[in-house]
A protein has these predicted regions:
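Short, acidic, Ser/Thr-enriched surface-loop or helix-capping motifs
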Residues: 51-52, 174
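Generic structural signal for well-ordered beta-strand positions
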Residues: 57-58, 180
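N-terminal targeting signals for export/organelle localization
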Residues: 1-46, 202-203
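Short active-site neighborhood of thiol/selenol oxidoreductases, capturing the structured segment around
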Residues: 59-83, 87
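Thiol-based oxidoreductase modules, predominantly thioredoxin-like and allied folds used
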Residues: 100-115, 130-139
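Conserved helix-turn-beta segment immediately C-terminal to the redox Cys motif
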Residues: 65, 84-107
Length: 203
């Protein structure tokens, strides 16, 4: 190869590398558009509750994987099932795109009076495999929600058919058990598909 050919080859290589970097930057957004990322992750507060199999769990259940945590209840008429369907669809889409890791979907009951472990298992299993349901003593749930800034309140009623007002946010918990980010809604599949790889990749 003569000097002129060598210079041309170097120039072509640099142009190709620059084009590849530009394409990658166009394909992989650097900042989330829909999630609010906390400046520093907040540790999940200590708690003692039950999973959907009735086994005792504590805050360490959030260690070792990414979690999408929603606070709701199985008798919720619309917001809860709709949000969980969105999370399930987003997780499926991310899996089809080859996203690793995939987040786990977690439902924490704000109606433990009715949400037994058995009922929680039926409910979370409806939205896919590997989901986690959490229920238990009301004071422990209140400890968890208060520490994460989640609101809920039971409507006063004399019967068993009552509603529970609650925050509709979805929390992103990192593998270290830290509250990393927040999706406040509206909950749209595309929003999660866009932002989750960025949030999970930035920890």
């Amino acid at each position: 190869m003569n000097p002129r050919q060598f210079i041309i080859a170097i120039a072509l290589g640099l142009a190709l590398a620059a084009g590849t970097c530009l394409a990658l930057r166009m394909q992989i957004p650097s900042e989330p558009k829909f999630a609010l990322v906390l400046p520093e992750p907040n540790p999940v507060p200590e708690f003692s509750l039950l999973n959907q199999r009735g086994m005792p769990i504590d805050q360490t259940v959030f260690a070792g994987q990414w979690d999408l945590v929603f606070f709701g209840f199985t008798h919720c008429p619309d917001i809860c099932p709709t949000t969980l369907q969105v999370l399930a669809a987003a997780k499926t889409t991310l899996q089809e795109k080859g996203q690793v890791p995939l987040p786990r979907i977690v439902l924490v009951s704000v109606d433990p009076e009715r949400d037994t472990p058995e009922l929680m298992q039926q409910y979370v299993d409806y939205f896919g495999e590997g989901n986690l349901g959490i229920t238990g003593a009301l004071d422990e749930i209140t400890r968890l929600t208060s520490g994460l800034g989640i609101f809920f309140a039971k409507h006063l009623s004399d019967g068993e058919d009552y509603a529970v007002d609650h925050s509709a946010a979805v929390l992103v918990i990192n593998p270290d058990g830290g509250f990393e980010a927040l999706f406040s809604g509206p909950h749209v599949v595309e929003n999660y598909v866009h932002d989750l790889p960025i949030v999970m990749g930035g920890n």
